[in-house]
Amino acid sequence: MQIKNGLDDCACCSSNGSDTHRRFVKREFGQWERISFSPEAGHILFILEGEIKIEDAKDTYVRGINQMILLGYNHEYRIKALTKGIMLVLSFTTHYHVCVNINAERVWRTMKTVTYRFNTLEMVPPMLDFAKSVMFYLDHKIYCDYLQESKAVEIFIVYRFFYTSEELAHFFYPVLYKDLSFDTLVRTNYEKVKTV
């Protein structure tokens, strides 16, 4: 499909790819290539083609097509491509609150029972459709920050409706555990303290 209008306007817009820590990017990788990501942000990897090997201090994991992988902040993973492939990557420095029915206390109750281990999620059909829609925009060089923000909100709607609380607690544990424990502490005690 040919983009008919708008890209000329986007080229000089200050919101065209200005936020480098909160955005989707397409990453193509060759066989045996080492893959790295900034530790200053968290990253969700959507493997669309190929297979990668992830190593940490404890173990080695091999993951492939239709898997999502979360790399938390200050992660210490070594990643190597086992085959040629393509992934969609969402980098983020904060998480999005998109639904009033998803509150910190409910997620925290689920997370308190979790013993974390490296975990991936299978991309269910709505998540695959979502990833394809983001790739469509990236393939057509549409990098608008407003589109990026709307897609970042949309992904959490997909998580909300198509994954269980337990799946999400295991998957997002590396980035949510500290934030949610502090948030719950504040919400529980805010009436008892003079300042927060």
Model-based region annotation:
Residues 1-18, 137-143:
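A short, N-terminal "cap"/entry segment at the start of jelly-roll beta-barrel domains
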Residues 6-11, 59-60, 119:
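Hydrophobic alpha-helices of bacterial signal-transduction systems
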Residues 17-111:
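N-terminal regulatory/effector-sensing and dimerization cores
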Residues 32, 163-171:
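Short, Lys/Arg-enriched N-terminal segment that forms or immediately precedes the first helix
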Residues 104-129:
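Aromatic/histidine-rich interaction motifs
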Residues 123-135, 152, 169-195:
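A short, Lys/Arg-enriched amphipathic alpha-helix from helix-turn-helix/homeodomain DNA-binding modules
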Residues 139-153, 172-173:
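All-alpha amphipathic helical-bundle segments outside canonical DNA-binding/catalytic cores
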Residues 159-166, 189:
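A short secondary-structure junction motif
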